[in-house]
């Protein structure tokens, strides 16, 4: 829910982009970015040096034009009827945000 609330604030305040950057080797972070609705924008090769190794950075972003679709997807996911009595989700967040994303990460 925190990502949803943060994105809601970002776009309500008039920002045009909300970015997610991570080590390109961090597949869980890349999967999370897509699940939350960030669109894959590419890899910045040798973006920085971390602990003596070149680190490629994977870039993802939501833009203000994406937000109406993503907000509706999050609302549907957070709706009480999307959850079973034991708390299990009926529809996965990633499935709901997928149609809103401009591009998927080919590395996943």
Model features per residue range: what roles?
Residues 1-108:
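Acyl-donor (CoA/ACP) binding surface of acyl/acetyltransferases
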């Amino acid at each position: 829910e925190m990502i949803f609330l943060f994105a809601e604030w970002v776009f309500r305040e008039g920002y045009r982009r909300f970015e997610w950057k991570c080590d390109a080797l961090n597949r869980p972070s890349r999967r999370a970015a897509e699940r939350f609705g960030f669109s894959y924008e590419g890899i910045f090769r040798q973006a920085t040096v971390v602990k003596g190794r070149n680190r490629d950075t994977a870039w993802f972003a939501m833009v203000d034009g994406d937000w109406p679709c993503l907000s509706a997807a999050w609302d549907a996911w957070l709706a009480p009827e999307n959850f079973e009595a034991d708390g299990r989700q009926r529809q996965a967040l990633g499935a709901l945000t997928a149609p809103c994303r401009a591009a998927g990460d080919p590395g996943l």
